[in-house]
Amino acid sequence: MQQSKEERVHDVFEKISDKYDVMNSVISFQRHKAWRKETMRIMDVKPGSKALDVCCGTADWTIALAGAVGEDGKVYGLDFSENMLAVGKQKVEALELKQVELIHGNAMELPYEDNTFDYVTIGFGLRNVPDYMQVLKEMTRVVKPGGKVICLETSQPTMIGFRQGYVLYFKYIMPLFGKMFAKSYKEYSWLQESASTFPGMKELACMFEEAGLKNVQVKPFTFGVAAMHLGIKPESK
């Protein structure tokens, strides 16, 4: 019987968890760290804030958020892969980050009350969920009025020539890197599939607005290989 997208994605991340961080650096040529750093600068996270990192994986962005909110803040990281969370927990414990709590859960149905967080992030995870809009609506639901919802994700380059090279890289080269460095050709073939079908920047910005967010900002990175989308939940009337 054919697996659902959710089942397939779960299997992928359970299998690649121990090599995920290394492969992120290989695949993005280390650029993902700079993209996240610039996104954090734009977010302007305030000390003492409360944040949720959805599809947190091995907790890199969760940890960055913890540094920004400080000891008086609180950061929750949520992921449905227990193996990815196990890697993240090792990092959090090594850094003795008492303000971080990692949770096994589903992005499609966040286990939090409405209007709970100042910031809700998702990094390189939205393309892997079964329903993009459902997750965006859930993120919007749990952020406070005036709070920010942020997505950092692969995108669709528009520059002629570069786009063709990007497609070839993701379709053929990235799975080979997966086989070479992580012994996971099949799993990294899935990652290129999910990236190739993900909405472009303009479409995702419209989805942010449809989810109920305002003042949507879009920041492309590296000729549009990745992009940040940031939206603000309107204040209650």
Curated annotation (Swiss-Prot):
UniProt cross-references to SUPFAM superfamilies, sorted A to Z: S-adenosyl-L-methionine-dependent methyltransferases
Signal peptide segment: none
Record keywords: Menaquinone biosynthesis, Methyltransferase, S-adenosyl-L-methionine, Transferase
Catalytic activity from the UniProt record: a 2-demethylmenaquinol + S-adenosyl-L-methionine = a menaquinol + S-adenosyl-L-homocysteine + H(+)
Gene Ontology biological-process annotations: menaquinone biosynthetic process; methylation
One Pfam family this sequence matches: Ubie_methyltran
Residues annotated for S-adenosyl-L-methionine binding in this entry: 58, 79, 106-107
Domain of life: Bacteria
Keyword set includes Cell wall biogenesis/degradation: no
Recorded GO MF terms: demethylmenaquinone methyltransferase activity
Gene3D superfamilies (alphabetical): Vaccinia Virus protein VP39
E.C. no: 2.1.1.163
InterPro entries for the chain: MenG_heptapren, SAM-dependent_MTases_sf, UbiE/COQ5_MeTrFase, UbiE/COQ5_MeTrFase_CS
Function comment: Methyltransferase required for the conversion of demethylmenaquinol (DMKH2) to menaquinol (MKH2).
Family: Belongs to the class I-like SAM-binding methyltransferase superfamily. MenG/UbiE family.
Cross-referenced NCBIfam families: MenG_heptapren, MenG_MenH_UbiE, PRK00216.1-4, PRK00216.1-5
Descriptive protein name: Demethylmenaquinone methyltransferase
UniProt source species: Bacillus mycoides (strain KBAB4)
Lineage of the organism: Bacteria, Bacillati, Bacillota, Bacilli, Bacillales
